[in-house]
Curated annotation (Swiss-Prot):
Organism of derivation: Pseudomonas putida (strain ATCC 47054 / DSM 6125 / CFBP 8728 / NCIMB 11950 / KT2440)
Identification of the protein by name: Apolipoprotein N-acyltransferase
Pathway: Protein modification; lipoprotein biosynthesis (N-acyl transfer)
Enzyme class: transferase
Gene Ontology BP, a term: lipoprotein biosynthetic process
Residues at the active site: E269 (proton acceptor), K329, C381 (nucleophile)
């Protein structure tokens, strides 16, 4: 097994397989021990490599992770973006290759400055800190792509109880630390005191996670609210077709008119497929209907505004009836809602001319939505995958709401991964979440991240259920990731300093 730690294709191919196997730890497969195993394979594989060799080992791991975990983007490129199969594959491979550098650069840094083979305990701690750094970085750089975090594997696992303490990143840190410590236990046997410390660091987080699993950090702020979430199941190639807009508006109107009386009536992202000012008459009619039933209607709708004498378009949510507020999406999907370098790319390839791919970013510090006297934190599609961003809104809310249109990704695992991340946000915040989508999965999620009721994908239906507004803050909403970030910064700073001192002695 020495070839695992040595340079060459056998080790690189194993890293590729390890990265790909992470997919099986996440939804919909949920074989969570594979998250620890895949990280352990990468950690072991870096032990004897030069910085350049470690960089490529990390690159292959990242390529495997994204290649297996985000292949479903092909559906939006080919089926809805107009790219030929060959072009879609080429674009997708380039996408995987670029994202793989999120692992290549940290592994180069690890081998160049941070690796401490002579100090196995410190080495494991620093590796976990670096793992957290790379997850945070890939959720931030160039607006971020915070997908496939290792911590999501624990939504139903023993570490789920850590989510309200430090979010998904605390779980990812724990998984990386566990993997590295397991690899190093045999090297600590000659030093009983260090072995004892390592054993505590290995077992304590898992014990704490199990002990806190199911612990209620928040309490009800009022009586349960009755909810109806409509899943229209509109085909993506018809959604923005002017000839089918009236039929879509009629669909949501008729399903709402025939629904049971509820407190909150929720439609998915861009359920109203025309600009809000153009559809205001329709929205007013639906608002009067909702008010007559003592309901609040919440729907996705594109919004047009004049900003500094410039016309801008936003992906939005608006509330009418017994509620108020409009929210404009802040976290946009690259190439889906805006095109980087659009002067160069637009027109060059049909894929970059997708409908509604010229949205502007909504302003920060927007007020939350209000409905039935409660504050609702809104997340439009992609926004729910950003842990810190989501926590900022959740801390001011009584209830969470996410609306989405995952039709872009067809019958793939992408929407199920998206659902898992929404469940983690509910668990981190200790709040109920309403999830309304065009074609699934529409669901209600409790404060422990559990789905209480849902509609199967690709069905036109109305989901009924109850949610409870919650108050008080989980530790994660109070402190976010700052305590963990400080610990990791100290660990990495110590490793850098220790390495420099060692080289001068």
């Amino acid at each position: 097994m020495r070839w695992i730690t040595r340079p060459g294709w056998p080790g690189n191919l194993l890293a590729l397989a390890a990265g790909a196997s992470t997919l099986l730890a996440l939804a919909p497969f949920d074989i969570w021990p594979l998250a620890v195993l895949s990280i352990a394979v990468l950690y072991l594989g870096l032990r004897e490599l030069s910085p350049r060799q470690a960089m490529w080992r990390g690159w292959w791991f990242g390529f495997g992770l994204y290649g297996a975990g985000t292949w479903w983007i092909y559906v939006s490129m080919n089926t809805y973006g107009g790219a030929s199969p060959l072009l879609a594959i080429v674009l997708l491979l380039a996408f995987f290759a670029a994202l793989a550098w999120f692992f290549a650069l940290p592994t180069w840094l690890w081998a160049r400055w941070l690796r401490r083979n002579e100090a196995p305990l410190a080495d494991a701690l620093c590796f976990a800190a670096l793992w957290l750094l790379q997850e945070a970085f890939r959720g931030w750089f160039l607006t971020g792509f915070p997908w496939l975090y290792a911590g999501y594997s624990q939504l139903d696992g023993p570490l789920a109880g850590l989510a309200p303490l430090g979010g998904v990143w605390l779980i990812s840190f724990t998984l990386a630390l566990t993997a590295a410590l397991l690899c190093n236990l045999h090297r600590l046997r000659p030093r009983p005191s260090f072995l004892a410390v390592a054993s505590v660091l290995l077992l304590a987080p898992w014990g704490l996670g199990l002990a806190l699993k199911g612990h209620a950090w928040t309490i009800p702020a009022g009586d349960p609210l009755k909810v109806a979430a409509i899943q229209g199941n509109v085909e993506q190639d018809l959604k923005w077709d002017p000839a089918h807009i009236d039929a879509q508006l009629a669909l949501y109107r008729d399903l709402s008119f025939s629904s049971r009386p509820v407190d909150l009536l929720v439609w998915p992202e861009t359920a109203v497929p025309v600009l809000k000012d153009q559809a205001q008459g329709y929205i007013d009619v639906m608002g009067r209907f909702a008010a007559e039933r003592h309901s609040a209607l919440i729907t996705g709708v594109p919004v047009r505004e004049e900003v500094h004498h410039q016309r801008r378009y936003y992906n939005g949510i608006t509330v009418t009836g017994e509620g108020d507020g409009t929210y404009l999406k802040q976290k946009l999907v690259p190439f889906g809602e805006y095109v980087p370098l659009q002067d160069v790319l637009r027109g060059a390839i049909e894929f970059f001319n997708l409908p509604m791919s010229d949205f502007a970013r909504g302003p920060e510090d927007q007020p939350l939505l209000q409905a039935k006297g409660y504050q609702i934190a809104p997340y439009i599609c992609y926004e729910v995958v950003y842990p810190e961003f989501a926590a900022g809104l959740a801390a001011r809310s009584d209830l969470l709401l996410t609306i989405s249109n995952d039709t872009w990704f067809g019958k793939s695992i992408g929407p199920l991964q998206h659902l898992q991340m929404a469940q983690m946000r509910a668990l981190e915040a200790g709040r109920w979440m309403i999830r309304a989508t065009n074609n699934g999965v529409t669901a209600l999620i409790d404060p422990f991240g559990r789905i209480t009721t849902q509609i199967p994908q690709f069905q036109q239906a109305v989901l009924y259920g109850e949610v409870v507004p919650m108050q008080q803050l989980t530790p994660y909403l109070q402190w976010r990731s700052w305590p963990l970030a400080i610990v990791c910064a100290l660990l990495l700073g110590w490793a850098l300093l220790a390495g420099r001192i060692a080289k001068t002695v």
